[in-house]
């Protein structure tokens, strides 16, 4: 059976969440997809949960196992097995609204010059509390500079869909970047063709204890690599994006430690650190927004239906 979309889910010790994640794929309102789950040597009940889900919910599911090599390796493994024209990635603890694949598939099908589509996403904590929706206010003005400034491409792992034909075997997710491989791939794709940004929410992004965000030093190391890699390839000063990204992460509630580290880092790595922080923080607030009461209730309700 031919498929248009390959969904790739790297899995490592997400037994608490993986069934809900798979359920959000199963309820997509189009059926032209396959789902490849790549287990990265889980030591909990994740694999057994996936097998039972597939037994009860027959469909185009594939469970692959590999020796523990990291999420990036698992994603790349899935890409190499994929049969679809398009690739969509989903982390094993995140959720998709039911129209995610249809909207992104339609966007790429209607514009053959586009290589990547990204959607807005809602951030939520356990207990279904939505913190913010991150979106661009004018999708028609999406370009490479905005992608770079905003760091939005860091969400490719769950929020994007890419045209598989533009990826080469040696240019997939970079295994040297444990926390920013999605942003790196987005930046490379932005050099190859058009990037579409949809205003509709395409991801419910879960914040929970134990995420990589807890390792500020590793995040900083990854972004240092990206600064060196891209500073001469884009007109926008990537150092500012680097600093602003760390600051933005802290502002999203990932912890006081982020706030202190990113602020100090900004002051000492930029010539005009305070101004850069102010300008980029204003930019971030333009690019994202808190939900109004009715929309918040609607989004929380949608998450609640999936996250149980």
Task: Show the residue positions of the predicted features.
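C-terminal subregions of glycosyltransferases and related glycan-biosynthesis enzymes
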Residues: 191, 204-308
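Short aromatic/hydrophobic "clamp" motif used to bind/position activated sugar donors
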Residues: 87
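Cell-envelope/extracellular polymer assembly enzymes that use nucleotide-activated donors
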Residues: 3-6, 34, 184
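A conserved acidic beta->alpha catalytic loop
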Residues: 24, 31, 39-49, 69, ...
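Conserved nucleotide-sugar donor-binding catalytic segment
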Residues: 80, 119, 138-223
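N-proximal low-complexity "stem/linker" segments adjacent to membrane-targeting elements
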Residues: 1-26
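Glycine-rich, basic loop-to-helix element that forms the pyrophosphate-binding segment
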Residues: 66-82, 103
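Conserved donor NDP-sugar-binding/catalytic core segment of glycosyltransferases
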Residues: 99-131
